[in-house]
Amino acid sequence: MLRAAIIGAAGYTGGELLRLLLNHPAIDTVEAVSSSHAGQSFCKAHPDLLAFAKQSFVSALSEGPHDVVFLCGGHGESRRLMDQHQLYHKNTLIIDLSQDFRLPDGEHDFVYGLPEAFGSMLPGKKRIANPGCFATAIQLAILPLAAQGWLSDEVHITGITGSTGAGQKLQDTLHFSWRHDNLSVYKPFAHQHLAEIQATLRTLQPEYEKTPLFIPMRGPFTRGILVSVHTLCKASADTLIRAYDAYYEDAPFVHRTTEEADLKSVVNTNNALLSVEKYGSHAHIVCCLDNLVKGASGQAVHNMNLALGLPETMGLGLKPSAF
């Protein structure tokens, strides 16, 4: 049995990890670190855990040993947290859910943990950078195109995300009275996840140098991401669909539907649902996923499973909300 720790366990991604790890068959102990909730029971931050866990948050990581440590601090905090908890020199699997290590900079040894693109590289790795939620959805929509070398023209993306994608810190755009029955565009053509998407595209199709044109939107719901992607594609409809089916044949969490992809089919699961169509000369792909599970904490558990040699679906057999 394995010993896990979560640093930043009181937030949305930390709480989702806590729920997953408390029910993971290979995890014996979960240590939950929170500077804001130290000494308080888990249910103070996550009321739904009242019936499932009686433990309390701690202020600092114990000496361990730990088999895996998840970093769930804010963006720009992970280097400080690794230093504060003396993780740099430990031979412990560290999975970072922030954006701090997603791009290679010559100074860190984290690998990018998108299992559907780089899963074969993850077994035995000790440092994994978890992808962003929008980046996960967009990449799942276009990975087969890049793998075939079919990207040639600009990729146009419209995406909508739930309010939990912005974290727990109070913002004007997270108030119920603003978010409810409302829509807005933010960071058009400049979203921070574009850099990691481009890095993957450069790996899979080096000759493709265009920047995806991405319009992100805030949605009036709490969980979920839907992205709609279209680009020119010379492949026929049948060839296009066969390429997607072949690419994801061994991917347990990615599924193509012949119906319209929708959020309620995937919210609360680690699944991603794809709709793949050809309209004239354009390929149109829709990807739906849960931003907190497949787009964050569930993907982190998937990465843990791969890195530690566990069955990759272990602990991730979750029930969708459905309606």
Annotated model-derived regions:
Residues 185-189, 217-219, 262-266:
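Short Gly/Pro-enriched turn/cap motifs at secondary-structure boundaries
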Residues 29, 153-157, 209-213, 253-257, ...:
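A short coil-to-beta-strand element that immediately follows conserved catalytic motifs
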Residues 190-256:
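C-terminal substrate-binding/catalytic lobe of Rossmann-fold NAD(P)-dependent dehydrogenases
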Residues 227-323:
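C-terminal active-site/capping subdomain that shapes the small-molecule cofactor and substrate pocket
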Residues 18, 139-146, 194-198, 241, ...:
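Predominant activation on well-ordered alpha-helical scaffold segments within soluble catalytic domains
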Residues 1-181, 186-188, 205-207, 275-279, ...:
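N-terminal Rossmann-like NAD(P) cofactor-binding subdomain of oxidoreductases
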Residues 98, 102, 160, 218, ...:
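Anionic group-transfer/hydrolysis microenvironments
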